[in-house]
């Protein structure tokens, strides 16, 4: 199965519709944070960047008078639930491996405590990475959802992140190959 790239995810019309709604700059920033945190905490950089990029794909438009209503959002939000479902469907349609699509979607589901009644969860390294990456880019009052970027600039940032992920995956594969080679000697 061929790896689905962030560029493929980025270019899909569903991604454009829903990630633009919740903030493309924020999505890209969280994906970059997730990449670096995944390396540090031994999580999959491929899964982390995809989950980081798609983590807010479930946002509803909580607007009042044309402005994002942060209080209304905090009171009624279930974007992590909707985002987990939406991202899973998108990734499967793009041809992502079902196990990886599920892992990414569950990380999206658990990236926030906003809908949880009890906050004592045991998260996996990937789930922690996405939560921390999102928190690293948050701004007071939800201002991180307002930043804008051109399609071209966003695409370049995504392509650069794809190159970083690909390079890291090659390094990981080489380590596995070297380890396997040494075990046969």
Where are these regions (language model features)?
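Divalent metal-dependent phosphate-bond-processing catalytic cores, especially two-metal-ion Mg2+/Mn2+ enzymes
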Residues: 1-3, 18-44, 54, 96, ...
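Active-site flanking loop/helix segments enriched in acidic
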Residues: 4-29, 64-71
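A generic structural signal for nonpolar/aromatic side chains embedded in well-ordered alpha-helices
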Residues: 9-13, 108, 130
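An active-site-proximal "capping" alpha-helix that borders the catalytic cofactor pocket
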Residues: 30, 37, 77-93
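His-Asp-centered metal-binding catalytic motifs of divalent-metal-dependent phosphohydrolases/nucleases
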Residues: 46-68, 83, 105-113
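A charged helix-plus-loop insertion that forms the helical arch/lid used to bind
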Residues: 67-77, 122
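Internal catalytic-core helix/loop-beta-alpha segment
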Residues: 86-104, 110, 114
């Amino acid at each position: 199965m061929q790896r689905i790239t962030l560029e493929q995810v980025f270019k899909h019309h569903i991604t454009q519709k829903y990630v633009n709604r919740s903030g493309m700059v924020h999505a890209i920033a969280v994906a970059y944070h997730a990449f670096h945190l995944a390396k540090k905490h031994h999580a999959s950089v491929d899964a982390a960047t995809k989950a980081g990029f798609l983590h807010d794909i479930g946002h509803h438009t909580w607007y009042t008078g044309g402005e994002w209503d942060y209080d209304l959002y905090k009171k009624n939000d279930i974007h992590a639930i909707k985002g987990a479902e939406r991202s899973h469907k998108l990734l499967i349609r793009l041809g992502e491996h079902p196990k990886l699509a599920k892992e990414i979607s569950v990380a999206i589901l658990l990236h926030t405590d906003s809908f949880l009644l009890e906050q004592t969860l045991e998260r996996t390294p990937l789930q922690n990475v996405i939560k921390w990456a999102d928190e690293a880019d948050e701004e007071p009052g939800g201002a991180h959802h307002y930043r804008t970027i051109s399609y071209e600039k966003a695409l370049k940032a995504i392509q650069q992140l794809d190159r970083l992920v690909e390079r890291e995956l090659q390094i990981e594969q080489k380590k596995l190959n070297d380890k396997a080679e040494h075990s046969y000697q």
